[in-house]
Amino acid sequence: MAPRASRRDCILASATPVGAAERAVLRLSGPDLLSRATEFLPSFCPHPRGLREVREGKLEFAPGCMSPVALFVFPGPHSATGEDVLELHYPGSPALTEMLLEHFFTQGVRLTEPGEFTRRAFLNGRLDLTQVEAVLGLVGSRNAQ
């Protein structure tokens, strides 16, 4: 049996479908994520003011391989999960996505378990049980009914 995931872990999920696209989005959530952001993304330093913001720049994925990226910053406890949340928007190349995932994994970030963003939102008081049930119904729906 795999060890139970900790609420102290920083988690990561792709917010876009697998495959080539104009833009891809990786979403990270975790307690104190903003204080660790420069470990994950050295070229970005979110302001300590605790404000929502968008930072644009270039990220070096490999020596000589740079790409434009935007970092959306949502400080907790006012984010969707009640924790610090970062969204990284970048060109939707599967190769870039793979490089980013590997980078975050080496920094101790792990992939989410199914429903983990919703679970954290509930545990942090951002969603009530009725809202969680609505999310479950929407995710599990098979048609527009």
Per-region residue spans from a language model:
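A glycine-rich (often HGG/GG-containing) alpha/beta subdomain
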Residues: 1-145
